[in-house]
UniProtKB/Swiss-Prot annotation:
<dbReference type="InterPro" id="IPR002022">
    <property type="entry name" value="Pec_lyase"/>
</dbReference>
<feature type="signal peptide">
    <location>
        <begin position="1"/>
        <end position="32"/>
    </location>
</feature>
<dbReference type="InterPro" id="IPR045032">
    <property type="entry name" value="PEL"/>
</dbReference>
<feature type="disulfide bond">
    <location>
        <begin position="330"/>
        <end position="358"/>
    </location>
</feature>
<dbReference type="Pfam" id="PF00544">
    <property type="entry name" value="Pectate_lyase_4"/>
</dbReference>
<keyword id="KW-1015">Disulfide bond</keyword>
<dbReference type="GO" id="GO:0005576">
    <property type="term" value="C:extracellular region"/>
</dbReference>
<feature type="binding site">
    <location>
        <position position="216"/>
    </location>
    <ligand>
        <name>Ca(2+)</name>
    </ligand>
</feature>
<keyword id="KW-0964">Secreted</keyword>
<dbReference type="InterPro" id="IPR011050">
    <property type="entry name" value="Pectin_lyase_fold/virulence"/>
</dbReference>
<keyword id="KW-0479">Metal-binding</keyword>
<keyword id="KW-0677">Repeat</keyword>
<feature type="binding site">
    <location>
        <position position="220"/>
    </location>
    <ligand>
        <name>Ca(2+)</name>
    </ligand>
</feature>
<dbReference type="GO" id="GO:0045490">
    <property type="term" value="P:pectin catabolic process"/>
</dbReference>
<keyword id="KW-0732">Signal</keyword>
<keyword id="KW-0456">Lyase</keyword>
<protein>
    <recommendedName>
        <fullName>Pectate lyase A</fullName>
        <ecNumber>4.2.2.2</ecNumber>
    </recommendedName>
</protein>
Length: 393
């Protein structure tokens, strides 16, 4: 049963009014409950791009009739039907986006697996086991969607049931775990875990002599989206991690947009794109990157990919990459037609690293918000790791 949680004290104390309200809610199949945690009312922190040129409050202004507890996909989509009204949706347990019915082909998966999150919404997991499987959360600005908060949930990356074949590039999957697209803006992602989970890349089969790839991105931000903060989150066991700006020719939509802050996140056993950026301006500080250049499944390739007109300011990050020597430190940043990258105060395998000689021009844009980069130490890296991801809010 989907519960519409009150989350507010009543303005009148009349027992009669309270009894009438509860009776009406029970008659409609919805029972009254309390807002489980005031953390659902929190706005994005002032640190990060989501605080700029406006605010990111999600569903904090929700009235009592737009606060929900949901336990399955039917209840979740019903709660989302409130549209742009402020709403808080509390996730209890596992939401199987497929509803337990396997996808039959590309068209079926496209129709049922992509869940659009409307404006003025907070989605927050309850406890330590809130989870989405077999689908994607989409924040799509086509209809003006903005002001969205996603917190304390685990998302298992979707498995494409019918990948498409591209000559020269092999089999490619379509679906991301999360996608912020088409001009969506003011989005805060916090204490979220995204992982390949129980279907890792070594479980791929082959088809027509080539690897049958069934995972795409973990969290992509593209097509003119803007003012995004990602904090205290974990991306674990994945290849194509985070694409910011989807291609080199989309300057009309992307130029001057795609401002993204990443802080206090952990990227564990991710192969690449943490992130790869075109056109965007990325601030990445006090994040932890863990990998192995000889990992048999998720072989570390690079963290920051600098694409066309993209720029990254990296500060106080920790790179613990097995089988990557200090002499090859520049492998943490890769040039893809881009030229702007700076790093200050980061460490590689426990020692200070100098990335100034990696062939990039300095990042000179002003960061408009006040922030505090903590000196990266082994203890800080462990603290960030211990705090990152779902179930730790």
């Amino acid at each position: 049963m989907m519960n519409k949680a009150s989350g507010r004290s009543f303005t009148r104390s009349s027992k009669y009014l309270l009894a009438t309200l509860i009776a009406g809610m029970m008659a409609s199949g919805v029972s009254a409950a309390e807002l489980v945690s005031d953390k659902a009312l929190e706005s994005a922190p002032t640190v990060g791009w989501a605080s700029q040129n406006g605010f990111t409050t999600g569903g904090a202004a929700a009235t009592s009739d737009n606060i929900y507890i949901v336990t399955n996909i039917s209840e979740f989509t019903s709660a989302l039907s409130a549209g742009a009204e402020a709403k808080i949706i509390q996730i209890k347990g596992t939401i199987d986006i497929s509803g337990g019915t396997p996808y039959t082909d590309f068209a079926d998966q496209k129709a049922r697996s992509q869940i659009n999150i409307p404006a003025n919404t907070t989605v927050i997991g309850l406890g330590t086991d809130a989870k989405f499987i077999n689908g994607s959360l989409i924040i799509d600005g086509t209809d003006g969607t903005n002001n969205v908060i996603i917190r304390n949930v685990y998302i298992q990356t979707p498995i494409d049931v019918e990948p498409h074949y591209e000559k020269g590039d092999g089999w490619n999957a379509e679906w991301d775990a999360m996608n912020i697209t088409n001009g969506a803006h003011h989005v805060w992602i916090d204490h979220v875990t995204i992982s390949d989970g129980n279907f890792t890349d070594d479980m791929y089969t082959t088809k027509d002599g080539e690897t049958y790839v069934q995972h795409d991105g973990a969290l992509d931000i593209k097509r003119g989206s803007d003012y995004v903060t990602i904090s205290n989150s974990l991306i674990d066991q994945h290849d194509k991690t985070m694409l910011i700006g989807h291609n080199d020719t989309n300057s009309a939509q992307d130029k001057g947009k795609l401002h993204v802050t990443l802080f206090n996140n952990v990227f564990n056993r991710v192969t690449e794109r943490a992130p790869r950026v075109r056109y965007g301006s990325i601030h990445s500080f006090n994040n932890v990157f863990k990998g192995d250049a000889k990992d048999p499944v998720y072989r570390y390739q690079y963290s920051f990919g600098i694409g066309t007109s993209g720029s990254v300011l990296s500060e106080g990050n920790s790179f613990t990459i097995a089988n990557l020597s200090a002499s090859k430190a520049c492998k943490v940043v890769k040039k893809f037609n881009g030229s702007i990258f700076s790093d200050n105060g980061s460490v590689l395998n426990g020692s200070a690293v100098d990335l100034s000689g990696c062939g990039f021009s300095a990042y000179t844009s002003k960061i408009p918000y006040i922030y505090d980069v903590q000196p990266m130490t082994t203890e800080l890296a462990q603290s960030i790791t211990d705090n990152a991801g779902s179930g730790k809010l």
